[in-house]
């Protein structure tokens, strides 16, 4: 069923989040994680909790559906590394879709990541850090130097942090440190203080291809919103079970609920069920880019009327009338 929802060229976003349990003591393999909700660009806040690695594929209407979700901790007995979990997520995406485009943030600017994606024959759009060096004209050159030499010549609009922005794009052919394979460095000017640097092995033949690469990366805000929706609408961090296996089981059930929201979101606007759900949610805005919140609120509102469960909502099928038959033995 999932493949029916996905376009012919799948885009998979991989990102890490956290589940913090600052007052927890008895949870299994409880480690220390960076609290993303309280940390800023200038200050990191660390608390007790777990790491969450998620891989989401975008549906035909650009809503995320999870294909991989795992809660893990560096305090586990046989824990290897966060990269091992990320590789599992990439392999899961490769198994489901023979070829896809993986979009990742700066935390995945790692030679091992590029080599893994090349090994599996996958395409990628990965944002580079300021420390990255690239081979340009047979000379190792800092990516920041290539960025500062150029100016964006391609004008386009992109959606970033809840707003539409005008961006100016440029691209240059380079080689990555890991595999020495030819890739493109796509530069995005006019949005952040320092222009963004995106590495991609996707083929670029026109300015439309450059715009497509940039928009593929900027669509990753949806996986960030996906995490927020899980935490707010399903109280993701408010679990009470202690075993890591049980925590992952609860995470699996939430993932199924989020997939159901994705299924409802793809229905037409005239669909009776979708209309009833949105009407119950009573949203402030008529249209939004991310509709999971209102769908979850609407379904919760409908189910709140079920005081004795939903079993009584269905008409019971009575068995066929059977006449009492007595067999007399002579």
Where are these regions (language model features)?
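Single, function-defining residue in the core of a domain
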Residues: 6-10, 21, 25, 58-330
